């Protein structure tokens, strides 16, 4: 069965809940941090990198599926500065504030290990790029680190 990419906000309510659950499962499967001092720390980590986008910008959360299986997702915002709450929950957001005139949009993307290397990540990025461009974003940024497994992808 071929892969499909669905904006979560466009899915029927029952499907949307299943897609959100599947995307959150991918989030935890691929998370760079898996151990937390407290349950609140774990919740904040999830909120910072996934839950915020699901709640605040569902139109910019795209889920890749094959049949009923969620393979990955991409989420983001078209204008980082318009999301002031991110400055509070993710302090690193303020570090790059001087770049947001040129690159206002940002993203988070995660794919299961089995779905990498098939072009799906590029298709997810293209979906989000089109959506943020339609909202007037002239550029998109992301943050990673030199040793991260995603460097080669970007």
Name the predicted role of every residue range.
Residues 75-109:
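Conserved acyl-donor/pantetheine-binding loop and adjacent beta-alpha core of acyl/acetyltransferases
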Residues 37-61, 66-67, 75:
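Active-site rim helix/loop that mediates acceptor-substrate recognition in acyltransferases
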Residues 103-105, 109, 132-145:
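Conserved GNAT acetyl-CoA-binding A-motif
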Residues 1-18, 29:
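Conserved N-terminal entry element of GNAT/NAT acetyltransferase domains
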